[in-house]
Regions:
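A short, charged, and often flexible helix/loop element on the N-terminal side
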Residues: 60-89
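Active-site regions of enzymes building and remodeling cell-envelope glycoconjugates
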Residues: 53-64, 117-121
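N-terminal subdomain of nucleotide-sugar transferases
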Residues: 1-60, 96
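Short N-terminal targeting/anchoring amphipathic segment
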Residues: 90-108, 121
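Acceptor-binding helix/loop patch of EC 2.4 sugar-transfer enzymes
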Residues: 67-76, 120-137
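Glycine-rich nucleotide phosphate-binding loop and flanking beta-alpha elements
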Residues: 14, 105-108, 128
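Short, well-ordered alpha-helical microsegments
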Residues: 47-50, 106-111
């Protein structure tokens, strides 16, 4: 049985030089070391594409973060709505492998009807509602 996993990351996880991406990068490395075939999806805003990730993953896709006023006016939180990409959805639909959404940031397609038959896992990085509550003060 082939072990394959989609990982949707809120940022490019290499170099592993700050909290959230450290966790994502070393998770990818550990899973790859165990023979899991990883299809990595990264939202990109300021961090360049990384060849090192291509050595660990079967495929690596990069998507722009959609910043601007229209993303800010959504009913969905900005950190989620600005990370929406129809290309991501298309790539997720190419197979039936499980999907790991890294952080609430990446969950725009979590409840999409086309993914209803898929195993979908959300790994919360922080207690997000408390984190943003205190940032707002």
């Amino acid at each position: 049985m082939e072990r394959r996993l989609h990982i949707v990351s809120f940022d490019v996880p290499y170099p592993a030089d700050y909290g959230g991406v450290i966790d994502v990068y070393y998770k990818i490395k550990a899973l790859a070391d165990q023979g899991v075939s990883i299809i990595l999806h990264c939202y990109q805003y300021g961090r360049p594409e990384q060849k090192k990730l291509e050595n660990l993953c079967e495929k690596v896709y990069y998507y722009p973060r959609l910043k601007g006023i229209f993303s800010a006016l959504s009913r969905e939180p900005y950190i989620i709505y600005s990370r929406r990409s129809q290309s991501l959805l298309s790539h997720l639909l190419e197979d039936d492998a499980p999907i790991l959404f890294e952080g609430l940031h990446t969950c725009h397609f979590l409840s999409h009807p086309a993914l209803s038959n898929r195993l979908r896992i959300v790994r919360a990085c922080n207690i997000e509602h408390e984190y943003y509550h205190y940032l707002a003060k």
